[in-house]
Amino acid sequence: MASTAKGVVVEFDFAVLNGAQLLFDVAQRYLQALDKIGLDMPTEEKYLAGRSYEEGLARYFKVVKTKKTAQKAARELAAAFAAAVSEVVTKSVAPSFRNFVTTIAAKGVKVVIATRAAPEPAAEAFAPLLIENVSLYREVSPFYGCPRWDSWRRACMANDVARANAIAVAGSGCGVKSALLAGMASMAVMKARVAHQDYTGASLVVNDLSAASAKKLLSYLQV
């Protein structure tokens, strides 16, 4: 029988962490080391953001005329970003985010914290938050800058959350778009680094995740 449980899926790496800036820094270093390939923000937005790593890199590699293989580079760049997230995640769970999670969970709404961090640092970072109605979901998305639409769906399925009764908490415009493609409503956390992206379609827009934004989300879910 299909789940009817209400839930919230938080893409921690972009909605809480400043993942967009971290990813840009990682990509810039990686491409420079790979073949002295430059990367600036307009180029990142034009060729990489909101696409699979492989598709975006293949498009950009044609422009810069490198002989490097996009498929291999995509795997390496995704792994490098996951490693960078793993390094900072244990220091990134602020009291305001704890309040966001516990406020929602206290109302019986499931909270799924999604991250690409490695198992050990993820467990260390989130263990104090894994109370009743809160779970951790790990997946390295093949998309640059946001989860792919089916990542949202898998996070719901793995944690017995009904997509029709769930809201995705995204940290970018492309995250909002992928949530829509997954058939989910979304709350967008507006980050200065990607504020230029299109947030059309977000059901809610907030500046951070806190007890106050949790109450807005609960009101939207009619809890």
What do these predicted ranges mean?
Residues 15, 115-117:
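Conserved phosphate-coupling serine/threonine residues in phosphotransfer and NTP-handling enzymes
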Residues 48, 52, 92-96, 117-118, ...:
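Short beta->alpha linker loops
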Residues 32, 105, 180:
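Anion (oxyanion) recognition and catalysis
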Residues 1-5, 118-223:
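Asp-based, Mg2+/Mn2+-dependent phosphohydrolase catalytic module
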Residues 3-95:
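N-terminal helical cap/lid subdomain that shapes the substrate entry/recognition surface
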Residues 16, 46, 111, 168-169:
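Conserved SAM-binding loop
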Residues 51, 107-108, 201:
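Structured helix-beta-strand junction loops
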Residues 83-113, 149:
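Short, acidic loop-to-helix structural element flanking the phosphoryl-transfer center
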